[in-house]
């Protein structure tokens, strides 16, 4: 039995304490003054999976109201990437309406999903017709059922593969995401990368480490350098050939051919690109807000 850390309301580690202090030193913003290119919106905390790694495992938090969300979307600076997350955002029956509200406000709608509902192609088509432009598809086990069981507590490779195929068939831009867990799925980066290369709708591959937030597998998390080594070993790409875009202490962003690759040692504190909509209608730095409100919202 793999050791899991139970959800809790507050992080009393030095890292958690420093993050809470960091949040207090960051301003929050009115939506119309949002400086972040991406705003992450927790549209529901319900989920249809019980993954071993989940930064917000609290399922009792009520959904944000669609009308209120539309009002927030209308205030954001035009061209914002509005990323709808959960829980699992596809559990909202009004997800197409939320996507339309984002498009009507002249933004880019993005859905971050585990992909289970997107195994249904008519549903994917409905979201595309509503205006969905980009999907971030979680593939922690690539296409291997046993890896999904080990990381996400469910054998779901067939549905994940079908979701991947449906997004390609519906020509929806897709980012493939994987949480890389030490000694479990490092080798799965190779088939993930191969799939990204063969599907023209895939624009990005994002590998991240396990974050010690919420519920997580209690084993040493991969460092940023280790993530890079996992990637280069799996792909056969030499580190000195990577076309670097940006590197910080916790993230590495580069281009490899037509694909953008992001490596993130989670959490990426101090990120200047991602904000989070708070229940009060303000925009806060994403990672700082998640940690300072661990176990809640």
Predicted regions: what they are:
Residues 1-33, 259-297:
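Radical SAM enzyme core and accessory elements
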Residues 60-71, 89-134, 139-146, 152-159, ...:
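Canonical radical SAM enzyme core domain
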Residues 149, 154-290:
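Radical SAM enzyme [4Fe-4S]-AdoMet core and its adjacent flexible, acidic
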Residues 39-41, 82-84, 109-111, 135-137, ...:
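Hydrophobic faces of well-ordered beta-strands that scaffold small-molecule active sites
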Residues 78-79, 105, 130, 170, ...:
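Structured helix-beta-strand junction loops
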Residues 13-122, 129:
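Conserved alpha-helical substructure of the radical SAM core
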Residues 43-47, 139-141, 209:
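Short, small-residue-rich loop/turn micro-motifs
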């Amino acid at each position: 039995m793999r050791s899991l850390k139970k959800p809790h309301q507050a992080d009393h580690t030095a890292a958690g304490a420093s993050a809470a202090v960091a949040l207090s030193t960051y301003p929050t913003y009115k939506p119309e003054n949002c400086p972040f290119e991406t705003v992450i919106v927790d549209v529901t905390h319900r989920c249809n999976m019980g993954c071993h790694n989940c930064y917000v495992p609290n399922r009792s938090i009520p959904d944000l109201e669609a009308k209120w969300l539309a009002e927030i979307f209308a205030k954001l600076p035009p061209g914002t990437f509005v990323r709808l997350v959960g829980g699992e955002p596809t559990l909202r029956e009004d997800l197409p309406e939320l996507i339309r509200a984002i498009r009507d406000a002249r933004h880019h709608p993005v859905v971050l999903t585990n992909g289970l509902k997107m195994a249904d192609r008519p549903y994917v088509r409905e979201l595309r017709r509503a205006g969905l432009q980009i999907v971030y598809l979680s593939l922690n086990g690539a296409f291997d059922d046993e890896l999904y069981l080990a990381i996400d507590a469910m054998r779901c490779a067939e549905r994940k593969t079908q979701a991947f195929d449906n997004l390609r068939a519906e020509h929806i831009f897709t980012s493939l995401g994987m949480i890389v867990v030490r000694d479990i799925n490092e080798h799965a980066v190779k088939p993930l990368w191969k799939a990204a290369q063969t599907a023209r709708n895939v624009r990005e591959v994002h590998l991240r480490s396990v974050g010690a937030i919420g519920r997580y597998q209690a084993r040493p998390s991969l460092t940023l350098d280790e993530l890079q080594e996992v990637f280069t070993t799996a792909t056969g790409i030499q580190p000195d050939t990577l076309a670097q875009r940006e590197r910080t202490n916790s993230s590495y962003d580069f281009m490899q051919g037509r694909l953008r690759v992001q490596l993130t040692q989670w959490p990426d504190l101090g990120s200047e690109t991602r904000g989070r909509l708070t229940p009060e209608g303000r925009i806060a730095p994403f990672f700082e807000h998640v940690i300072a409100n661990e176990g809640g919202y």
